[in-house]
Regions:
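Asp-box/BNR beta-propeller blade signature and adjacent active/binding-site loops
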Residues: 1-186
Length: 186
């Protein structure tokens, strides 16, 4: 998955001169999607799942936000993408039924999230694992608890929810991978 912000050299220089962050500059649009290769990784093409313009962001009082995404293949050709949306309190979702070539209109899920990047993983037996901080608060201080949710029905519901830590810390960008039957978390 990728997320893209068209930053110009001028915007970067402006940020450096002012001693501020590049995301303090307004951008014309922001997008999230996946990169597909048909030649073994020699070249890639972007497939956009979500794109919003500066005008749309202004409706919410934003000049910038982070639609960071994660993707899992639920069934052959059916991909589900979840992404965070600053200030919305819920993860957004988009689905593709053609291996990521095209994507459906994003919609809000019922999964709480305080604008923290989630991660989807698929187990060898087909279950979907979500690593998330399910809190609908805002800001870094809302990035807890850290939980694993497991779906046995392609994300139609979550059969098991495991609290890894409910300490009110800041669990940002939790990550993991599956090797064999073992789930590794960082």
């Amino acid at each position: 998955p990728y997320h893209y912000y068209p930053i110009t050299g001028e915007m970067e220089r402006n940020s450096l001169e002012k001693g501020t962050y590049v995301w303090k500059n307004p951008v014309p649009y922001i997008e999230s999607g996946i990169l597909l290769s048909e030649d073994g990784g020699e070249t890639f093409k972007r497939r956009v799942a979500f794109r919003t313009t500066a005008e749309e962001m202004k409706k919410y009082g934003l000049t910038w936000f982070w639609p960071e995404n994660t993707v899992a293949e639920l069934e052959s050709g059916h991909l589900a993408m979840l992404f965070r949306m600053d200030g919305f309190g819920r993860l957004q979702r988009s689905d593709s039924y053609d291996f990521g070539e095209t994507w459906g209109e994003p919609f809000a899920t019922d999964i709480p999230n305080p604008s923290n990047k989630p991660q989807l993983l698929k187990t060898n037996d087909g279950r979907i694992v979500l690593l998330n901080t399910p809190n609908d608060g805002k800001g870094l201080e809302a990035r807890f608890p850290l939980e694993i949710w497991i779906s046995e029905n392609n994300m139609a519901g979550w059969n098991k929810k495991i609290v890894l830590s409910d300490f009110p810390g800041v669990y940002s960008y939790a990550n993991g991978f599956i090797e064999g039957n073992i789930l590794y978390l960082a």
